[in-house]
Every structure is written in structure tokens, then in C-alpha cells.
Amino acid sequence: MAQEGVKWPKPLVRLNGVALIDRLIDVFLKNNATSISIIVNEEMTEVQDYLKALRLPIPFYLLVKSTPSSMHSFYELSHYLDGDKICLTTVDTIFKEEEFSGYIQQFIQEDKLDGLMAVTDFIDDEKPLYVETDNELYIRNFLDQADGDCRYISGGIYCLRRPALGVLNNAISQGMSRMRNYQRQLIAEGLRLKAYPFSKIIDVDHADDILKAESFLKS
């Protein structure tokens, strides 16, 4: 985004005057997170300084490490996760707060699930990951290309329970990378995953996404 004239590193990009990272932390606090862990790559020194100055009312872990993929970032963060319930996302994933609250509530209530994955039928992604579900929204597969039945794509928000971390360790030891391959591995190892539809989820990848995201949040 710097090449497109955006002056901030992505976590500090403002939407309606609020930095992406502040918005995300605030949403997690409002939904009763018991701790927050953030990984930042080594080049983002401005973001590191910004986060080091934060004071939160719950335990806050900041990990500075550059990794080859988002799955590796999750693996590095997983060492800081002590509870049974995890919600994972990236800083550029924009969603409606009230939908996120409903999502968290369903994950807590459906305690037999190994994972509840945010999905949307709003497709504005360069390389979407299609999510194949049954009639009850249990996930059958994750696909790079849509087949006839795929209504949803991955929204990039993941609620997971402890068994999913075992699969993560297996995926790393097998040399896998990328979150989409990890998600396929969750299915391959027989974990119970369900999809939770959001009306719309936007990724802030480019400068013109900032205005789109701002108007979406105001709508």
C-alpha cells in the first residue's frame, strides 16, 4: 500500500479516524477476550513501537517475528495461547461488529465444534478460498476454485479449539504453509468445522479499499 501513496504501515491505516489495529483490539475487548496476542514482522518498527506503548486491561503478548506465511505466524502465536478457545484474524479484515459478536456467541455455545469459520457470499477477493458446506453449514472442504455448490468464501476469521493446534503442529512438521492448506488439513484429520456467514467481509489490501471499508462500516 505504500507504493499507492498510503503513508501508514497497514496496521496503523486509519478507517474513519481509527487505526486498524486499535479497531481490532477494541472489538476483541468488547467480546470478552481474556488475552490478546499479536505478531508483527521485524520490518514494521513503527508498528512495534506503537504496540509496545499500549496498555490493555487484559494480558497482552507482542511477538516480533517475520514468517514465511500466515500459517507460520499462527504457529508462532500458538505458543502464547493458553485457553481452550481462540479467535484468530489479520489486521486488514473488516467486518461489522454486531456480526462478530453473534459469531463469538455461537462459537461459545456450540462447544462440540473444533472450529467455527467466518464465511461470506460477498466475493471481492483476488484469490478467494471457497468453502464447501452441507445444509447445516458443516464444512466439507476448502477449494481454490468454486464447484457448483460453493456459495461462500473464507472470511479470514477463525474460531478454534485446542484440537486445531495439534493439527497446526502436524502441518508445520509436514512442511506445509498458508492458512488455506492448514484448513484443508483440519478437514483431512477429521475435525468438526462449521461455517458462520457474515453479510460482508472486506480486506484492506489497496488504497481504494480504505474508502470502501469506511463507507461499509458507516452503512
Describe the residue ranges of each PLM region:
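A generic "structured core" feature
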Residues: V6-P9, V27-N31, I38-E43, L54-R55, ...
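A structural signal for short hydrophobic beta-strand segments in well-ordered beta-sheet cores
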Residues: L12, V131-T133, A195
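Short beta->alpha linker loops
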Residues: N16-A19, E42-E43, K65-S69, E99, ...
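Conserved beta-loop-beta/alpha segment of the NTase-like Rossmann-fold superfamily
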Residues: V47-Q48, R55-D134
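Catalytic-core segments of class I nucleotidyltransferases/pyrophosphorylases
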Residues: I108, Y138-I202, D208-S219
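Phosphate- and divalent-cation-binding pockets in alpha/beta enzyme and binding domains
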Residues: R23, E46-D49, H72-S73, V167, ...
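Short, well-ordered beta-strand micro-motif
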Residues: R14, Y80, E132, C159-R161, ...
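N-terminal glycine-rich phosphate-binding loop and ensuing alpha1 helix
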Residues: M1-V47, S101
